[in-house]
């Protein structure tokens, strides 16, 4: 196997190479590296090729350790939702991981963190138990043998719910939980409407996100961060905004990122008012319909508890997302 690695400096080269790989991720896209570059990270992009064809990619984010902590001149390296490659190709995986390890040593990094979208277990259907993934288990064992250490610090969600979009709309509806279908129809009867959004809606989106964070007990970043995190992908054609309105006012919204064959439900927000009209159910369905019409193959609900445990703080989120008929749950 003659694998050549090169550094990429052009957006079109990077995104087209990335899109040709299995399961490319939005967090490995050029625009996401540009977003992070505004917040202390430097993005370096590597492509591995064999016979002139891209076989792997890694967008490596690097930053210096924050001042005032023990190693002020040292660096940390992070490959969000990467590297991207066919993990069943053990020789390729070994070459990619070896190159990344060498980079960390050359830069004298405190650590190098990777979190590839590698399924360790998958469940089919809304109520089935996860089944182990042979490839995931093999890669996990190989990483342990190579002195990689499982991190206790979660950056991205370990688990997610996915919906295949190959079926027609009637079949997608039929696969939903009956209560979810009912709530979609209820929202329509209650006069909820869904429209596309733009940057002119950002102030309203951030206000709703703040209201959601207080109600659900999570912390959000300053407004300026979201102007970049939402605006850059939107301008690059990698994001779509949906707003559900009741009586002419936004009651809920979501921001969908998309790259390659996949859409990700990255951000959701809602007001406490009009929740009885079920705007979030119709909103989600319209986003799914758009993703299908756009030719995407997978809708990723982006985030779920590792186990469907009613005592888990995220169980309510899981139940809402699972109601749309997801077909698999992978633990990364």
Model-assigned labels for residue ranges:
Residues 2-69, 116-134, 143-276:
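A conserved beta-strand-loop-helix scaffold within acyl/acetyltransferase catalytic domains
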Residues 98-99, 227-332:
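Aromatic (often tryptophan-rich) hydrophobic motifs at membrane interfaces
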Residues 90-91, 119-137, 306-313:
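Short, flexible/disordered intra-domain loops and linkers
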Residues 70-83:
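N-terminal cap/recognition module
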Residues 130-153, 314-330:
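Conserved acetyl-CoA-binding loop of GNAT-fold acetyltransferases
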Residues 91-108:
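Short secondary-structure subsegments characteristic of cysteine-rich extracellular domains
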Residues 80-88, 129, 275:
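The substrate-binding groove and active-site-proximal loops of carbohydrate-active enzymes
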Residues 106-123, 291-303:
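Conserved GNAT acetyl-CoA-binding A-motif
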């Amino acid at each position: 196997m003659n694998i050549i690695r090169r550094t990429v400096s052009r957006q079109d080269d990077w995104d087209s190479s990335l899109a040709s790989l299995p399961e490319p991720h939005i967090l490995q896209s050029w625009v996401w590296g540009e977003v992070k570059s505004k917040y202390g990270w430097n993005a370096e992009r590597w492509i591995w090729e064999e016979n002139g064809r891209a076989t792997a990619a890694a967008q490596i984010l690097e930053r210096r350790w924050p001042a005032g902590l023990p190693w002020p001149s040292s660096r940390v390296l992070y490959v969000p939702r990467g590297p991207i490659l066919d993990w069943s190709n053990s020789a390729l995986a070994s070459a990619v991981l070896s190159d990344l390890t060498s980079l960390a040593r050359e830069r004298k990094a405190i650590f190098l963190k990777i979190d590839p979208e590698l399924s360790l277990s998958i469940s089919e259907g809304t109520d089935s138990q996860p089944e182990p993934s042979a490839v995931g288990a093999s890669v996990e064992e190989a990483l342990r043998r190579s002195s990689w250490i499982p991190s206790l610090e979660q950056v991205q969600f370990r688990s997610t719910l996915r919906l295949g979009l190959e079926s027609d709309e009637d079949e997608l509806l039929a696969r939903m939980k009956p209560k979810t279908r009912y709530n979609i129809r209820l929202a329509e009867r209650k006069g909820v409407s869904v429209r596309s959004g733009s940057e002119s809606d950002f102030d309203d989106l951030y206000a709703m996100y703040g209201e959601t964070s207080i109600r659900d007990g999570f912390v959000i970043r300053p407004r300026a961060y979201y102007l970049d995190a939402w605006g850059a992908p939107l301008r690059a054609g990698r994001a779509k905004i949906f707003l559900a309105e009741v009586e002419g006012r936004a009651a809920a919204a979501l921001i969908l990122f998309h790259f390659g064959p996949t859409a990700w439900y990255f951000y959701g927000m809602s007001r406490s008012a009009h929740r009885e009209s079920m705007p979030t159910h119709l909103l989600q369905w319209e986003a799914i319909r758009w993703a299908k019409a756009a030719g995407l193959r997978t809708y990723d609900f982006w985030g779920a508890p590792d186990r469907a445990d009613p005592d888990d703080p995220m169980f309510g989120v899981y139940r809402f997302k699972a109601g749309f008929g997801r077909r698999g749950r992978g633990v990364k």
